Curated annotation (Swiss-Prot):
One of its GO terms (molecular function) is sigma factor activity. GO terms for cellular component: cytoplasm. Induction: Up-regulated in the presence of cellulose. GO terms for biological process: DNA-templated transcription initiation. InterPro entries: RNA_pol_sigma-I, RNA_pol_sigma_r2. Negatively regulated by the anti-sigma-I factor RsgI1. Binding of the polysaccharide substrate to RsgI1 may lead to the release and activation of SigI1. It comes from Acetivibrio thermocellus (strain ATCC 27405 / DSM 1237 / JCM 9322 / NBRC 103400 / NCIMB 10682 / NRRL B-4536 / VPI 7372). This is RNA polymerase sigma factor SigI1. A motif (Polymerase core binding) lies at residues 67-80. NCBIfam families: PRK08311.2-1, spore_sigI. The gene is sigI1. Keywords: Cytoplasm, DNA-binding, Sigma factor, Transcription, Transcription regulation. The keyword DNA-binding applies.
Length: 256
């Protein structure tokens, strides 16, 4: 039993390394001039940018009409360019610093009409090299409250799903991801189907297939991803839910 535990731990660690390597590979391609990948990367991490902006300014951010959010987006883009992959720093902690510094620059040039909490200028948010080497580099921990993440983690475990499974089972094509999000939302909003999911620990495939008018194989092939997204829709992970709502649009609208 102990050997099996160690093997499982090693496997998860190895998969973590694979995910991290993929993340770094994406950053390298962006820094080498892949503009489409850069746009997709920034779009994917808008919830993180929104969270940093909201925390920094101490207020709700309307992404459709916010100078601060526009500045934060620009700062995140700047962080991509300035990030030194070879130093092994945590990209998200690094980009958070860049965003906060640009927001501070903006606030100082607009003192007359902007008010920010004192914590906005605290040094505790500017990390030393040791903290920047942290490997909490990717996933929900970057955008949501830890207790809500732990609650989701427990529910996923009931289905034999980990956060790593979620990362590894993301459909490659945007239209496939959008379809899975719609299926997950449909499953989450239908009490009868959701109760069946929680009771049987499996998607009520026939009911969902009939309601969504999709092939059963589509549901089966994306089972883990759909279940995870459904649980997110039923959770307190509000930023993640808003992002999923945004992702089902045409990609031209902003977060709502």
């Amino acid at each position: 039993m102990e050997v099996r535990k160690i093997n499982t731990h090693n496997r998860e660690k190895k998969l973590d390394d694979i995910v991290y390597d993929d993340f770094i590979s994406t950053l390298r391609q962006i820094k080498e001039g892949n503009h489409q990948l850069r746009e997709e990367f920034i779009s994917e991490y808008k919830p993180f940018i929104l969270k940093v902006t909201s925390n920094a300014t101490g207020k709700y951010i309307d992404t459709r009409n916010s100078d601060e959010f526009s500045i934060a987006l620009s700062a995140f883009n700047e962080a991509i360019d300035k990030f030194d992959i070879e130093k092994g720093y945590n990209f998200f902690l690094f980009s958070e610093q860049v965003i906060r510094r640009r927001l501070i620059d903006y606030s100082r040039s607009n003192k007359d009409d902007k008010e920010y909490p004192f914590s906005f200028f605290d040094d505790e948010y500017f990390y030393n090299n040791e903290k920047l080497l942290s490997k909490s580099y990717i996933g929900f921990e970057d955008i949501e409250a830890r207790e809500d993440i732990e609650e989701l983690k427990k529910k996923l475990q009931e289905f034999g799903i980990t956060f790593l499974d979620l990362v590894l089972n993301v459909p490659k094509h945007r239209d496939s991801r959008q379809l899975c999000i719609r299926l997950a939302k449909m499953l989450a909003e239908d009490e009868q189907m959701y109760n069946a999911l929680m009771k049987n620990k499996n998607i009520p495939r026939n009911e969902l297939k009939k309601k969504a008018k999709v092939h059963g194989r589509t549901i089966g092939n994306n089972r883990k991803y759909i279940i995870a997204l459904c649980l997110i829709f039923r959770s307190n992970l509000n930023l993640s839910k808003r992002y999923l709502e945004y992702y089902t649009m045409d990609g031209e609208s902003d977060l709502i």
